[in-house]
Curated annotation (Swiss-Prot):
Keywords: Ribonucleoprotein, Ribosomal protein, RNA-binding, rRNA-binding. InterPro entries: Ribosomal_uL3 (IPR000597), Ribosomal_uL3_bac/org-type (IPR019927), Ribosomal_uL3_CS (IPR019926), Transl_B-barrel_sf (IPR009000). This is Large ribosomal subunit protein uL3. One of the primary rRNA binding proteins, it binds directly near the 3'-end of the 23S rRNA, where it nucleates assembly of the 50S subunit. The keyword Acetylation does not apply. Transmembrane segments: none annotated. GO terms for molecular function: rRNA binding; structural constituent of ribosome. Residues 128-156 are annotated as: Disordered. Belongs to the universal ribosomal protein uL3 family. The gene is rplC.
């Protein structure tokens, strides 16, 4: 995994390109993220950097967390996150990662917690079709068959049914950065990213999965 950055989703807006076409973008406050620890294969078994984000009051953290951050002379931070990389020698403890880590036109993956929708039914959660809406129908939004009869005599695990929708770790892949504002640490990403405004997100260079 390449090195990324933590940020806060601020909301969505639109900007216009040179041809006056509206582009929907999500504004993310990316960083600053000081590096609090560097892990190597010799000491930890794998190579990674640990970054912090979200300054808070000292009394909001435990003594163990404050002691860990003090080793890198980092102010109290709410979130810690690791990015695995084989190029740890390019980073130093105390170094601050900012929005200029990315550039306009770069393709990224954004990971966050999707908006929680509570207990949802079959149509909303899995896009099942409705039953007949006629006056005599008794099957408007029911699931239909959930399996066979006496054999196997049970519902197989993993059957799509009603339940909790959202509030899960989600990654939106292959999003394009439209603009970067290094002075204000803002990254404008084309399209939507997981979570509500104020949600924590992680931006990393795109990792192609499957066919290109």
């Amino acid at each position: 995994m390449a090195v990324g950055i933590l940020g806060t989703k601020l909301g969505m807006t639109q900007i216009f390109d040179q041809e006056r076409r509206a582009i929907p973008v999500t504004v993310v406050q990316a960083g600053p993220c000081p590096i609090t620890q560097i892990k190597t294969k010799q000491t930890d078994g794998y190579a990674a950097i640990q970054v912090a984000f979200g300054e808070v009051r000292a009394k909001s953290l435990s003594k163990a967390e404050l002691g860990h951050l003090a080793k890198s002379n980092t102010a109290p931070m709410r979130h810690l996150h690791e990015y695995r990389t084989g190029e740890v020698d390019q980073f130093q403890v105390g170094q601050v990662l900012k929005a200029d880590l990315f550039s306009a036109g770069q393709v990224v993956d954004v990971t966050g917690t999707s908006i929680g929708r509570g207990f949802a039914g079959y149509q909303k959660r899995h896009n099942f079709k409705r039953g007949p809406m006629a006056h005599g129908s008794k099957n408007h939004r029911l699931p239909g068959s959930t399996g066979a009869g006496t054999t196997p005599g049970r519902v197989y695990p993993g059957k799509r049914m009603a339940g909790q929708l959202g509030s899960a770790r989600t990654t939106i892949r292959q999003l394009t950065i439209v603009r970067v504002d290094p002075e204000r640490n803002l990254v404008l990403i084309k399209g939507a990213v997981p979570g509500k405004p104020g949600a924590l997100v992680s931006i990393t260079p795109a990792n192609s999965v499957g066919r290109k």
